[in-house]
Amino acid sequence: MANEGSDPLLQYMISPRLKKPPQLLFPLPEDNEVAIPMPMTPSEFKERLIFGPFSCSPRDSSHFIDSMKQPSPSSSSTAVNNPFSDSSTLDPLLPPPPPQPEPWLSDQTSSHCQGHALHRSKTAPAMAVINDLHHPIRQKDPTETSRSVVRQAFALLVVYLSLGVLIYWLNRDHYVVNQTHPVVDGLYFCIVTMCTIGYGDITPNSVVTKLFSIMFVLVGFGFIDILLSGMVSYVLDLQESYMLDSAKRRDEPEKRRSYIIDVKKGRMRIRLKVALALGVVVLCIAVGVGIMHFIEEIGWLDSFYLSVMSVTTVGYGDRAFKTLPGRLFAAIWLLVSTLAVARAFLYLAEARVDKRNRERAKKVLCETMSVSQFFAADIDNNGCVSKAEYVIYKLKEMEKITDKDILPISKQFDKLDRCSNGKITLLDLLEGGSGD
């Protein structure tokens, strides 16, 4: 019992209220004790912003331990007497000091906390959507945009044709024409002029009508472009999406579907687009042959001749529509067939360009890198070519991108890279958002 006075454990059990207040100076780290939480590193700060507080992190409190642990009188009295126990005195970015778990809980949680190295999954949603707070993105539905373009194109076409018919009706005596009905003749004249066919069966013979025809032709080119880029593209996109959905739903072999769908790009193959466009042109010619033979009462050969000359916008003028039903049909048929032919030529040009690009890409990927190509690919002139530099150089050789395409992207990167260290960090984005 001689050592009873010097035994600290026995003294604490006999008189716990006589315990000395905690020291204001904390033990050094070499004693394997840390009294205050260490400041977070940038990587831990980034993980905390994205994932939130980790349950097993030594800097954050464990919800599991807090729910299982019962508060003890000694710990509560220590928290009251400790002047540094108030978390409000700490930096708001630093988490509160972690509570000490019970011994029977420390063994179970140590295995989970040991070797903590979490990485954000690419498919995991962020707990704090930082980008939406500073840069809210308003996504527009592409379908609504396409529909608005179609409505605008249709409205402009109606205004264009209505104005043309009105001017023709007011000046119908100044045209050389085999008249049927003023409105039908005016609509027929407007369509033939806009589609640049020019049969020659209706011609102006005064100064006013000639000036009107000049203006009408020049404005008609713009309307053809609007119709091609608006209404026709919208209809063809709907057709393409419908065919893609139908091909995906069917239980067909992958090899058979690959002839229709480009699986890698998720679109119809260009050869199928060309075939469909040419099929529409052939259908327009066939419909024109039948209507001309039965309505205009001309022979099969002359019907086929006039149909081809009309669809291809040649229009020699030796044959034309003379009856009222024929001109009313031609007002619709010529517009549709002209747009179909124009789209077919666009698809043919796209097919040739696509074939040339595929051949060039195959040639570029098969050749090895020479010394001159190595120095050309070394963008930063550091004596080695990184993967990004190699990809950029190969894309340039394939003529998919140019320096003009890369320059605005580099300028945008320099704006985001506020530290000018060649990297964009989360702190740069936050500072950029607060600065904006």
UniProtKB/Swiss-Prot annotation:
It comes from the Eukaryota. One of its GO terms (molecular function) is potassium channel activity. Residues 93-102 have a biased composition (Pro residues). Ca(2+) 1 binds at residues 378, 380, 382, 384, 389. Residues 71-92 have a biased composition (Low complexity). SUPFAM superfamilies: EF-hand, Voltage-gated potassium channels. Homodimer. This is Two-pore potassium channel 3. The lineage of its organism: Eukaryota, Viridiplantae, Streptophyta, Embryophyta, Tracheophyta.
